[in-house]
């Protein structure tokens, strides 16, 4: 599969199309500080964290979400329209769970690209893709969510799951996703959000900032602080209404969202 610029998308490849960006703060690299950074500094710090946990990422997701992440992803994929010979992109695909769920919705001649900036995470995703015999249907590709490098109007659908809060420039990422969608194409975004009940917010904060770092570190034996960064990044991410407005500002229309698990996560659906 190639694009008009001549890039070939087969197997796990490296896509380099990242212009210079600026460090958002001069703070020392601590997990809580990184969650407020922007640009290249944030990107590099986040990549180090995810590289350290790539091999246990799926296990940790299951343990830390009590298995709910599977349900959340299945519901997210259900918002992707069924298309004959469709083309879909999963941004920040990580270990490719969402890409695998989207693939059947693209039809027998459809293709899905699972993109992520982190090589180690994509290696884990590629194992799943090839293990299911889908190497010709799903391509794993290293790409920056802010500068995806595809021509305008390439995809019928773009999905993302738990990626957007990790990008250095969220507005830029949303605009680039809008650019590469075909007119009428759909963007489906699954991300952690703000619980809608006060008691749930209190419980969720205790779990996120107290229990999650302890459990994550014990399971992953991680020393990078990623399990402190993750809840901090969730707290600093736009809530349901703010993200909806950002999608509208990026040029999307008919933007709606659905809360799952009391607003712990939300699915935003936007049409170009």
Description of each model-found segment:
Residues 13-48:
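N-terminal auxiliary segments of SAM/dcSAM-dependent transferases
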Residues 63-86, 101:
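Conserved alpha-helix/loop element of class I SAM-dependent methyltransferases that forms part
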Residues 87-147:
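Class I SAM-dependent methyltransferase SAM/SAH-binding core
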Residues 146-157:
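A short acidic, Gly/Pro-enriched loop at the edge of an enzyme's catalytic core
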Residues 156-170:
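A short SAM/SAH-binding and catalytic strip from SAM-dependent methyltransferases
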Residues 171-183:
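A short glycine-rich, Lys/Arg-flanked "PGG" loop and its adjoining helix->strand segment in the class I
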Residues 186-215:
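Conserved class I S-adenosyl-L-methionine
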Residues 250-272:
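Core SAM-dependent methyltransferase catalytic element
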């Amino acid at each position: 599969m190639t694009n008009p610029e001549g890039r070939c998308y087969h197997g796990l490849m490296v896509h380099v199309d990242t212009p210079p960006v600026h460090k958002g703060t001069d703070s020392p690299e601590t997990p809580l500080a990184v969650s407020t950074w922007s640009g290249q500094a944030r990107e590099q710090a986040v990549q180090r964290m995810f590289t350290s946990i790539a091999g246990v990422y799926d296990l940790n997701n299951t343990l830390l979400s009590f298995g709910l992440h599977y349900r959340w992803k299945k519901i997210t994929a259900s918002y992707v329209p069924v298309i004959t010979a469709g083309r879909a992109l999963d941004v920040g695909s990580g270990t490719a769970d969402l890409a695998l769920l989207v693939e059947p919705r693209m039809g027998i001649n459809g293709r899905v690209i699972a993109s992520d900036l982190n090589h180690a995470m994509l290696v884990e995703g590629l194992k799943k893709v090839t293990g299911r015999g889908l190497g010709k249907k799903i391509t794993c590709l290293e790409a920056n969510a802010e500068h995806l490098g595809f021509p305008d109007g390439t995809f019928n659908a773009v999905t993302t799951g738990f990626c957007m809060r990790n990008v250095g420039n969220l507005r830029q990422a949303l605009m680039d996703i809008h650019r590469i969608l075909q007119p009428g194409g759909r963007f489906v975004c699954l991300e952690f959000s703000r619980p809608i009940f006060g008691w749930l917010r209190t419980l969720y904060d205790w779990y996120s900032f107290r229990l999650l770092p302890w459990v994550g570190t014990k399971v992953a034996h991680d020393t990078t602080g990623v399990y402190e960064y993750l809840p901090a990044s969730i707290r600093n991410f736009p809530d349901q209404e703010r993200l909806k407005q950002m999608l509208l500002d990026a040029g999307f229309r008919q933007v709606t969202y659905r809360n799952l698990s009391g607003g712990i996560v939300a699915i935003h659906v936007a049409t170009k």
